[in-house]
Amino acid sequence: MGPPSSSGFYVSRAVALLLAALAAALLLALAVLAALYGRCARVQPSDLHHSGVPDAASSPRGTQEEPLPTWPPRPTREPAGTATPGHWRPPGPWDQLRLPPWLVPLHYELELWPRLRPNEFQSPTLSFTGRVNITVRCAAATARLLLHSLFLDCESAEVRGPLSSGPRDGALGRVPVDDVWFAFDMQYMVLELGATLQPGSRYELQLSFSGLVYRDLREGLFFSIYTDQGERRALLASQMEPTFARSVFPCFDEPALKATFNITIIHHPSYGALSNMPKLGQSEKRDVNGSVWTVTTFSTTPHMPTYLVALAICDYDHVSRTERGQEIRIWARKDAIANGNAAFALNITGPIFSFLEDLFNISYPLPKTDIIALPTFDNSAMENWGLLIFDESLLLMQPNDQVTDKKAVISFILSHEIGHQWFGNLVTMNWWNDIWLKEGFASYFEFGVINYFNPKFRRNEVFFSNILHHVLSEDHALVSRAVSLKVENFTETSEINELFDLFTYNKGASLARMLSSFLNENVFISALKSYLKTFSYSNAEQDDLWRHFQMVVDNQSKILLPAPVKSIMDRWTHQSGFPVITLNVSTGAMKQEPFYLGKVQNQTLLTHNDTWIVPILWIKNGITQSLVWLDKSSEIFPEMQVSDSDHDWVILNLNMTGYYRVNYDKVGWKKLKQQLEKDPKAIPVIHRLQMIDDAFSLSKNNYVEIETALDLTKYLAEEDEIIVWYAVLVNLVTKDLVFDVNNYDMYPLLKKYLLKRLISIWNMYSTVIRENVAALQDDYLALVALEKLFETACWLGLEDCLQLSRELFKNWTNHPENEIPYPIKSVVLCYGVAFGSDEEWDFLLNMYSNKTKEEERIQLTYAMSCSKDPWILHRYLEYAVTAAPFTFNETNIMEVVAESEVGRYIVKDFLINNWQAVSERYGTQSLVNLMYIIGRTISTDLQITELQQFFGNMLEEHQKLTVRAKLQTIKNKNLENKKRNARMTAWLRKNT
């Protein structure tokens, strides 16, 4: 042993060796981390040679191999499997939502082989294999290819080319594929090449793949089980929109990347196959077990985006007809076809096609149209070119559908999907941020189509009930989104799915309608013809549409606009919300301001550009006036001043074609109230609707006093239009009011006030129900509004309503073939249970067990919650938790029961001992929803604390953090409702 050092520190040999080993290990670890840095999660193709991921530079691969990491598990349909936060990869184009512009797809040769066999569909999944050859044109030199792929296993990948320019497109060579890996979070397949693709050259990507088909998932490929002719059967279908094609085959899954498709489907011989185009031929092939399969090939499609690729494999029958040389077939269950359920849809489909062909002066380009009715289809309907897919409840007429709105619903949806053959299929938006260009216009033309075939159809009133009322109730600045969004605002694929909402469809349709109203229909259609012709088989952006409108406007002199079409319409599509237009009839002063919930006063919350260029169509004393424009925050229009005469009044927003609310000064509202009481018919129905809807919405949000809205209801004894009554009742007798009304003296006053006015319209329709209910089948507005009228009359205790409910319910329970009239069935079932015993409740339970349609089962689910017997409701909750006989996918029974006055206390008591079972059955989010429902009556901080303590053990930590804020919001809303209800009660005392 040597002497110690006089300075520093001493390290023994053993420690030195240990430190050296640790240092070496650290260096090795750093080297491995450096090598692995940037690696994305990969799925190893079975027959591909793999080596490490190169740097991000777009250059050919070297020959040096690197050690491979452990392969991660293959993706599943579980959300957690699609993200790769734990896997490293270098930054690159796979981090972007949009594909890089390196390749342009020209043509797909697609073969799909789902292993669907008769009587072999007990599993929740089945497998499929496929091959796709994609001809692409190289637009930028690259040694790396990106295309979309999700939940697919790549079996092989080759790149051939460049292709010769001859007629046979022969390959001049092959480009080595060194590696294939997947960026799961952005849903990309990445091919690393051994050579660089050259700009201007064409190549063919040859990919083999496999995946799973899920039962009832309704995304990509899915299969469904149904009953037909007494037997359980299966079918397979597709839903590619918006981004599910990539889960069926690797592809360039963006709407602007259109291509032609040759599709081949391999299927069991007992099934038939459908796709976008007519069948070209059939052959046979054997699988490895020697089983024979049918190979069906289809003709080449026009240029179209991947989201329109469609297929179905089924054992269905069909009915057909020919319209202008085009074959139209409707496919459905054999029972449904034999019973004639598809006849109505078949009879109107051809004429709708012909009408739109003539309107746009562009022929439908496909030789056939197949429409298939699936037993269930969550998307309602899909417009795939040549193969439209529907939920059968929205396409097929049942014998008991005569006194329903089913004919109108089928007509609306068929018109919408057929409208897409031009808006969306022929001309496609460049990207999903402008999805309203297809959905908004398809929704708008629903009404034009139906109005053409039924001139008595009340287009304005129906547009209000179906479109405008709903979207104006939900749209407001600060919270709602704009119709057209910036592409750069999107970062995740899931955000695309969120665009299929009220603003895309309803607001888009409303803006199209407003545009048509201030241009006139001829100019509107001329511009659309030009737009559709120019961009046929191509893509367009919103600015392209405005450009064609401007061209048509510039070529005429009758219509003068205060600004270019783009300047006018961009305000409406790029800004969220809508304006409130206020007119002072004494001075003619008009102003606009954004509509905010609760009329936000904090100006710092407002956007810098919070005005619109507003078209004002208006009437004075019943006479239509010239269009004026409000293109600034305020302006004076002397022509809108009114005199002191009782006969002088003004209404803005003719036919409710403008997308805004209208307010008046006190004199203006008083003039309209006086006119309603003197001669309501002098004001058109659509404007009686408008005044009621605007006044109540404005009062709810503090723009006018509630008394102003209530004053407009005094005349209602003279109102015989049920759609106006509908507007009154949905605004006045709200769910919150019904839920809380027993806490106030309002109910007896409201009962007396409304029944005095409602009795006339009630007598009219109750007589029809008793004596000639079939007369309602062509009265769409009555079918829409009757349920609310009936529900309110019974809630107010109108004895004739209660008696009619008892009669209809008893007649049905004694003879189930005597159907309760559909428009009021939910109300009759509810009151039948409410005034019945366990015998009536058990009857509904038995009916529920024998029903197969989800719509009918949900209706019965709600009705059974109407019982007023605590023990029955408690038993109902036990059934709900044990799931027998209730299926998991249906309505959350706990929440339904909690909605009733009796039920909310039963649910609260039930949760004390059963919250774990409720959480397992419905999820912890349901507990949050239940807390909000039960909390509808809270009005103090102490009640909030008590409710939080009650639910404290049931909620997850992250939910507890947000719950108190939500309960505080509910409390504030309840306090506002109390103030509002107190003022309503005071007004009713004076006017009853």
Swiss-Prot record:
It comes from the Eukaryota. The chain crosses the membrane at residues 14-34. It is a single-pass type II membrane protein. It is an enzyme of class 3 (hydrolase). Residues 2-13 are cytoplasmic. GO terms for biological process: peptide catabolic process; proteolysis. Substrate binds at E241, S380, A381, M382, E383, N384. Keywords: Aminopeptidase, Developmental protein, Glycoprotein, Hydrolase, Membrane, Metal-binding, Metalloprotease, Protease, Signal-anchor, Transmembrane, Transmembrane helix, Zinc. Residues 47-92 are annotated as: Disordered. Changing A139T: No effect on coat pattern. Expressed in skin. Expression levels do not differ between dark and light skin areas. Binds 1 zinc ion per subunit. Residues 35-992 are extracellular. Its EC number is 3.4.11.-. Zn(2+) binds at H416, H420, E439. The active site is at E417 (proton acceptor), Y505 (proton donor). Metalloprotease which may be important for placentation by regulating biological activity of key peptides at the embryo-maternal interface. Involved in coat pigmentation patterns. During skin development, may be required to establish the periodicity of tabby markings, initiating a pre-pattern at or before hair follicle development. Belongs to the peptidase M1 family. This is Aminopeptidase Q. It comes from Felis catus (Cat).
